[in-house]
Amino acid sequence: PVVLGGDDSLTRNFGAGLDGGPGDPRRTLLVSGPRGIGKTVALNELEDEAASHGWIVLRAQPYELIEPLVATVIPQALATLRQQDPGRRRISGVTVSGIGGFSTTAAPGDKPAPSLIGSLNTLCDELPPESGVLITLDEVQSVNAKELWQLTAAVQDLRRDGRDIAFAAAGLPDGVASLLQHPGTTFLRRAQHAVLAPMTPAETLTVLRDTAAQGGVEIPVGVLTDAATLTRGYPFLIQLLGYHLFERASRRGQPASHDDLAAVTPDVLKTLGDLVHQPALLHLPAAELAYLEAMAEVQEGQQAVPSAAIAQQLGKRVQQVSMVRQKLIDRELIYSPRR
């Protein structure tokens, strides 16, 4: 079963922005957070919120931003709209991702290929009353800064013309911060910024309990508490652990037990390592990898590790490892609770 956990204020505020008119600042949103914190899920929720308001959702792709929007995504949205009776046209929610076989090309002698802003204006002209266009972009830190400027400039111009258009993007914190230093991203610096954080223990307990209950599996309070502690509020791990715990208890047809939790934990942590940690460590320099290994050695039983303890484990002074520590923070592989 699917149960969304955590605070829904982000989605509610965004929905209020869609109702607020073209000048509402909540219509431009940047979501950031570390790997596995739920940024893509948050974007999906924003898309669903827009669809519930009758808006069209256009998903932009980070590695090739403008051309697919103009050649594929917007034409596909227009084709979907034009299939409806103009007099009775009402959008219940259209999402176009740009991944597929729909595209348009100009035949010889045709007018020049349309621009992004021209294509968006054409789409807005076709919209029924009280509808609009939401453009979403995941992994924004991977986008070419010049193309991002083209997109945000188009959104800004359309908003100035009173068009109902919104933009929501998600990315890693330091990557987003670096991107916003680019001179072409002034518009995004004024966007609403939401930083996703780990779920609270209470939220973790609730989502594990409610998800299992929807599938007919009971997780006793003691098991819930230990499971929540293991996840540390990390959404990817909550989902992964919850899935394995639910599956094992469901097979037995009995409430989940501490034995179930102990049995699934090794596989859960291995999967976490394979899917999240291993790709992130693949090309890591030896000094940074050694720092992480030392940190893991001394962290057991602690939420955070003093830099001095890591330096001691490495046989070095704090000043000698400070640059390595900063590089790992920049890579979003570790974080400082005091930052």
Q: What is the role of each PLM region?
A:
Residues 146, 314-330:
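Short amphipathic alpha-helical interaction segments
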Residues 52, 56-57, 64-101:
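Conserved NTP-binding/hydrolysis module of P-loop NTPases
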Residues 233, 239-318, 337:
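Winged-helix-like regulatory helical subdomains adjacent to P-loop NTPase cores
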Residues 329-339:
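A short, conserved structural fragment
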Residues 107-173, 181-184:
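Conserved Walker B catalytic segment
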Residues 25-45:
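Walker A/P-loop nucleotide-binding motif
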Residues 1-27, 73-76, 83, 92, ...:
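A short, basic N-terminal segment
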